[in-house]
Amino acid sequence: MRKFTLILMLALMLIAPIGAEARTYVLSVGIADYEGDDMDLKRCGQDAIKFGEVMKTQTQDVVTITSRAATAENILAALNQICTRAGEGDRIVMFYSGHGAEGCIVSHDLKAVKYEDMMSLFLASKAKDIVCFFDACFSGTIAQDVKSTDKNIVFFLSSRPDEMSQEDASWVGAGYLTQALLKGLRGMADTDHNKQVTVIELFKYIYNDVTKRIEKRNAGAPDDRKVKQHPQLVCAKQNYDMVLAKW
């Protein structure tokens, strides 16, 4: 009896920390190669790979899908899988770089992956925190699909609902938002130097970085070639201090 009790106590000691520690599940999607020849982008697949690499410094639960593998079916299946795996208190992080349209992102097979469908999966999950980064044209339209919930919802969007999102293939992250995001998560956004990056720190860094690059790009350009891009944050103020990265 004593032997059984000792074994049980040891088992509980091993199990308890696993159940108590919140986990972060990451889905990183990037599409540069679309069906046909007219829709291809520059380095969105690399955007997803680089984001996945950065997130692997925070968690080992990272799934990356790029280009031809990023069909609508595969994207939703992968998202459903991590939403199902996530338990109470866990966090889901989704990154997307590629084409966007009103109310959706666009898969490799040129199908609409609707924001409302992704939101349904997020809300059905037991996860407490939902953090998304969308580097896509018209990504600001997702705001209308954010429902009232007790979950901590945080969306970083590359542009307003009526704006295009810019890219530059000479960068490590081609998308303007992605470039700023990667630098910010690596510590550039840590304004108080406490080795943690919070939601509001990261957004302020991204917004300033992107708008400065847009201003530089527009300098000297004719009016018909000037562009606009203003990153957006969809988030309750109570989540501004949520820690997204630490080292």
Which role fits each region the language model picked out?
Residues T5-L6, M13, P17-W247:
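Cysteine endopeptidase catalytic domains of the caspase/legumain-like
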